[in-house]
A protein has these predicted regions:
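N-terminal beta1-alpha1 ligand-phosphate binding loop
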Residues: 2-29
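Short hydrophobic segments within beta-strands
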Residues: 7-9, 37, 162
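A generic structural motif
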Residues: 29-35, 186-187
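N-terminal beta-loop-helix "entrance" segment that forms/cooperates
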Residues: 39-53, 93-97, 202-205
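Glycine-rich phosphate/pyrophosphate-binding loop and the adjoining helix
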Residues: 46, 187-230
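Short, basic, low-complexity termini and linkers enriched in Ser/Thr/Gly/Pro
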Residues: 51-100
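Helix-loop-strand module that forms the ligand-binding subsite of alpha/beta enzymes
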Residues: 94, 99-184
Length: 230
C-alpha cells in the first residue's frame, strides 16, 4: 500500500486541524498507510546547529529524541491565531543538538519513504504557522550539506494542503504555503484544497463537525489527491 504522511500545523492537543486530519484519515485508511509526522522537538533552524547534527550523526547513531524535555513559555510572544490556537512562537523549541539530530534523521526518513504529504494547518496572521516554516526550512536543506546542489527529501514530493480556521477559511495561509512548497520544488496539488470556516459551536466546545458540504469538499480533495499520487 502507498503511504501518505499527515502534517498538522498546530501543536495543540485538540487542534481543530488534527480533528480535520482524522476525518481525512477515515476517507483514506482502507487504501493507504497513514502516518502523522511528529516534529514537536525539532529546534529552530540554523546552520551551526545543522553542522553539529551532521557531525553527531557521523560519530554516533544511538541518540534518542527526548519527549520529556520541559517547555518554556514566553509571555512576550504569546498570541492566538485566527482559529484560536496558540502560535508556535509562544513556545520555545527544545534546543538539544544531539537528540534533535536523531529527530531530524527520523523525520527525513519518514518523508523520504512516503508517497505523498497532506498538510492540515490553521492560519496565523494571514499566513502559515512558524513551526511549519521551520519544518520546511529543515526539509529543504540538501541531504549532503557539503554539496548545496544535492537533492532534498522533499524535492518532487507530492503534497496538498487543507485548513480549518476563521471566516477566511485559511485561504491566505494556503496560498502562501503553496508558494513556499513550490519554491522548494515540491509537486503541489493546489486544486481542490479544502478550507473550513469554523462555526460558533466549535469556539465554544473545542470540537467541530463538518457540514455535508464541507465533507463533500474534503472527499473531493482526497479523491483528487489519490489520482494525483498515481
Amino acid at each position: 500500500m502507498k503511504h501518505i504522511v499527515f502534517i498538522i500545523g498546530s501543536l495543540r492537543k485538540d487542534s481543530f486541524n488534527r480533528q480535520l486530519a482524522m476525518v481525512a484519515e477515515s476517507l483514506l485508511k482502507d487504501r493507504f498507510v497513514i502516518s502523522y509526522l511528529d516534529f514537536e522537538n525539532l529546534p529552530y533552524f540554523n546552520q551551526d546547529l545543522e553542522s553539529s547534527i551532521v557531525n553527531s550523526q557521523q560519530s554516533t547513531d544511538n541518540s534518542q529524541c527526548s519527549k520529556s524535555a520541559p517547555e518554556s513559555k514566553s509571555s512576550s510572544s504569546s498570541h492566538r491565531s485566527e482559529d484560536g490556537e496558540l502560535e508556535a512562537g509562544s513556545m520555545a523549541f527544545r534546543q538539544q543538538p544531539i537528540a534533535n539530530g536523531f529527530c531530524l534523521k527520523e523525520i527525513r526518513q519518514q518523508i523520504l519513504d512516503c508517497d505523498g504529504i497532506w498538510v492540515f494547518t490553521p492560519e496565523y496572521n494571514r499566513s502559515y504557522p512558524g513551526l511549519l516554516k521551520n519544518l520546511f526550512d529543515w526539509l529543504s536543506r540538501p541531504m549532503d550539506i557539503s554539496n548545496p546542489t544535492n537533492a532534498t527529501v522533499v524535492q518532487g514530493k507530492k503534497i496538498t494542503v487543507s485548513g480549518a480556521g476563521g471566516n477566511n477559511k485559511t485561504a491566505s495561509c494556503r496560498e502562501k504555503l503553496n508558494e513556499l512548497l513550490r519554491f522548494i520544488k515540491m509537486d503541489v496539488m493546489t486544486e481542490p484544497q479544502t478550507g473550513i470556516a469554523l462555526g460558533k459551536e466549535a469556539w465554544t466546545n473545542g470540537e467541530f463537525k463538518l457540514t455535508d458540504e464541507q465533507l463533500s469538499e474534503l472527499k473531493m480533495q482526497a479523491e483528487r489527491f489519490v489520482e494525483f499520487l498515481g
